[in-house]
């Protein structure tokens, strides 16, 4: 059953209501008419601003957010006690499930990356990445880990050094264990958690043409049921978890910024300063979110990565450089040596509260944070292969994090043991939020480095806020990415308002505990996502391994002389030649096939896209993807093999095919009419086998490209 668009026109106190069919399944659209000023409204009543939302998800998530914020405002202490108790009970009672789940996530992602599934594209077979590799890495890094690295770079290694889980405190063994544990908490396990959600959303969103929402990962289990109540609940859960994570991180981060400004400039640590900081950060994030991923988020992420590298290199150069590089190599060895043991070590035979306070807390936090980071990574990863996605997401940020933690953590331990005589360890224990600034006091130019650190923390918060708001907006709109600016402003502002309200009432800790508690049910959802990925990819491989999936078969069957084929390959047709070919050869061939199919009781039609000029033969199929054989003009850069090549046109225009199942297209420029018909028939035979095969039925029955 389709949803409807609700259009409301407000004129004075009256309102007129109308409805029309909406063609996008599972999505409700609301049209708001925004009044202009009195002077502007002469001759024009209103300016239309369209809000695109999935109504049950939008209303449900806003209601749940309001409920939890209300509890935090009305009874912050009572709420903190209840949610903290819930968090403690979950971590102690189900910690084994967290460890086991994260192990499954990691090994599943590695298997998908390095098996035959790794060759699948996140999108059609010939899709290309939307962002440069460096921009892509910068954005996923800033969204996934950024602010935590600033907060824990000095604090966590120093804390484990002073109070390690097993070694004697403040010893060489404690140094080794401190860095090994820190690497473990910030290494590939965290990114494996993010990868599960990100890969699931990207794969089913771009490969199965489903909405870019968490519910789509449940498609192999629920099929069309993802558009019903269960799907709504999953998306509401994801929105609320993301909003609460954003709000608590923003609130605690503002406290750190305020501490830094107090440490540097003597600015008082007060609620008024903190509310002002929330306003400034939210305003900058709003500007960024309005400009979108391609501009605001990308530019801020790249700037942040550049400044972070600059700060890290400064500490590396002025610190014990040679020692740090040796430490880096040793730390990686310690990490790899203990990787499997720590993955499954819950201290079952010698219970330690340390595991609940650190490892299990981290796993729960990464899981609760994964809808946000996973969705954002999915949104920017179209066109990547599964192998490229997993290896980049797992290893590139982790390796940078390892170097970062070594530079700051080992330098801090070195300073504490050789210069500060234990003073830095005591300062960190007293106040973790100013540990980084106190660390800079032992290095040259502390004012400059501390100022840069405050700037980095601020930008990290902006990038988290704007990317998080984009993610929430995408889920609330049913997977729509091209939403109105006002809609994105709403979500970005709401995260700032929630943080400000809870800062004022002292409810941040309660909300953080509630957020971490949600990791338990969501870990079960994530296990289903892993299963869904294997089921979906198995159906996909059945399609790609069917005959004809790799290219055209008309040439070998048509007896074209090899000399002519070589001449066609080396030719460089211009735009006019391709347009003429489409009109004179492709169109008659497609029309001939359509007539014959219709005569044989298989209705078919040929259409032309008004904007691109693409020609499409479509054969409808009830309950399956339609058969589509399309041909469109595409432009390709030519390599120069000789000096002569460099003097002629460096662009080649092709008549390239495309298909409804996302198979890779190919150039048919120069084929005769009967050769084109042979190619269409071959692809139709392949399509028939595709929709009839039980192995590929899941993909064959998924929606058409949106």
Swiss-Prot record:
GO terms for cellular component: plasma membrane. It is a multi-pass membrane protein. Keywords: Amino-acid transport, Cell inner membrane, Cell membrane, Ion transport, Membrane, Plasmid, Sodium, Sodium transport, Stress response, Transmembrane, Transmembrane helix, Transport. It holds the Pfam family BCCT. Induction: Constitutively expressed. The chain crosses the membrane at residues 55-75, 94-114, 134-154, 181-201, 236-256, 271-291, 305-325, 358-378, 389-409, 442-462, 489-509, 516-536. The keyword rRNA-binding does not apply. Disruption phenotype: Inactivation results in loss of protection by both glycine betaine and proline betaine after an osmotic upshock. PROSITE patterns: BCCT (PS01303). Belongs to the BCCT transporter (TC 2.A.15) family. This is Glycine betaine/proline betaine transporter BetS. It comes from Rhizobium meliloti.
């Amino acid at each position: 059953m389709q949803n409807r668009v609700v259009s409301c026109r407000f004129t004075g106190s009256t309102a007129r209501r109308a409805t029309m069919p909406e063609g996008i399944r599972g999505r409700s659209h609301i049209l708001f008419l925004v009044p202009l000023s009195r002077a502007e409204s002469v001759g024009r009543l209103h300016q239309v601003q369209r809000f695109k939302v999935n109504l049950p998800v939008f209303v449900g998530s806003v209601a749940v957010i309001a409920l939890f914020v209300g509890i935090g405002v009305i009874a912050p202490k009572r709420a903190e006690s209840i949610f903290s108790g819930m968090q403690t009970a979950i971590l102690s009672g189900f910690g084994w499930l967290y460890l086991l789940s994260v192990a499954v996530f990691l090994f599943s992602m590695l298997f998908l990356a390095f098996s035959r599934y790794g060759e699948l594209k996140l999108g059609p077979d010939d899709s290309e990445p939307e962002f440069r590799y460096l921009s892509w890495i910068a954005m996923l890094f800033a969204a996934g880990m950024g602010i935590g690295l600033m907060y824990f770079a000095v604090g966590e290694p120093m804390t484990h050094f002073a109070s390690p889980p097993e070694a004697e405190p403040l010893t060489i063994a404690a140094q080794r264990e401190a860095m090994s544990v820190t690497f473990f908490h910030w290494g590939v396990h965290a990114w494996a958690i993010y990868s599960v959600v990100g890969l699931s959303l990207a794969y089913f969103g771009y490969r199965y043409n489903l909405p870019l929402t968490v519910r789509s990962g449940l498609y192999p289990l629920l099929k069309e049921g993802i558009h019903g109540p269960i799907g709504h609940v999953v998306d509401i859960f994801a929105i609320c978890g993301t909003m609460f994570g954003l709000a608590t991180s923003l609130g605690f981060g503002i406290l750190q910024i305020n501490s830094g400004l107090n440490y540097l400039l003597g600015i008082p640590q007060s609620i008024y300063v903190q509310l002002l900081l929330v306003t400034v950060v939210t305003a900058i994030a709003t500007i960024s979110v309005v400009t979108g991923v391609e501009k605001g988020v990308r530019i801020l992420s790249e700037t942040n990565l550049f400044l972070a590298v600059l700060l890290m290199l400064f500490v590396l150069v002025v610190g014990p450089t040679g020692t740090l590089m040796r430490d880096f190599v040793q730390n990686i060895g310690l990490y790899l040596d203990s990787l499997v043991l720590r993955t499954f070590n819950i201290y079952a035979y010698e219970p330690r509260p340390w595991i609940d306070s650190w490892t299990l807390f981290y796993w729960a936090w990464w899981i609760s944070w994964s809808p946000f980071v996973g969705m954002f990574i999915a949104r920017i990863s179209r066109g990547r292969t599964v192998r490229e996605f997993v290896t980049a997401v797992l290893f590139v940020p982790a390796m940078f994090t390892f170097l970062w933690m070594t530079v700051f953590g080992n330098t801090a331990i070195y300073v504490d043991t050789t210069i500060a005589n234990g003073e830095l360890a005591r300062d960190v224990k007293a106040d973790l939020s100013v540990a980084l600034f106190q660390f800079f006091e032992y290095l040259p130019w502390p004012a400059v480095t501390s100022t840069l650190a405050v700037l980095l923390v601020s930008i990290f918060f902006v990038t988290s806020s704007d990317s998080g708001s984009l993610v929430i907006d995408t889920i609330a709109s049913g997977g729509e990415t091209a939403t109105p600016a006002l809609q994105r402003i709403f979500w970005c502002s709401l995260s700032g308002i929630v943080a400000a309200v809870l800062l004022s009432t002292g409810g941040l800790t309660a909300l953080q505990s509630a957020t971490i508690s949600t990791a338990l049910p969501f870990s079960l959802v994530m296990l289903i996502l892993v299963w869904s990925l294997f089921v979906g990819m198995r159906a996909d491989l059945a399609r790609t391994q069917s005959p004809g999936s790799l290219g055209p078969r008309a040439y070998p069957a048509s007896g074209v002389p090899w000399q002519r084929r070589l001449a066609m390959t080396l030719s460089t047709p211009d735009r006019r030649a391709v347009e003429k070919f489409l009109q004179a050869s492709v169109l008659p061939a497609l029309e001939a096939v359509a007539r014959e199919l219709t005569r044989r009781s298989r209705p078919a039609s040929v259409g032309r896209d008004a904007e691109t000029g693409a020609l499409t033969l479509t054969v409808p199929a009830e309950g399956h993807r339609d058969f589509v054989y399309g041909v469109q003009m595409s432009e390709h850069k030519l390599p120069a093999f000789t000096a002569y090549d460099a003097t002629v046109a460096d662009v080649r225009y092709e008549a390239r095919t495309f298909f409804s199942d996302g198979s890779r297209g190919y150039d048919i420029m120069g084929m005769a009419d009967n050769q084109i018909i042979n190619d269409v028939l071959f692809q139709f035979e392949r399509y028939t086998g595709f929709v009839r095969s039980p192995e590929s039925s899941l993909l064959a029955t998924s929606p058409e490209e949106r």
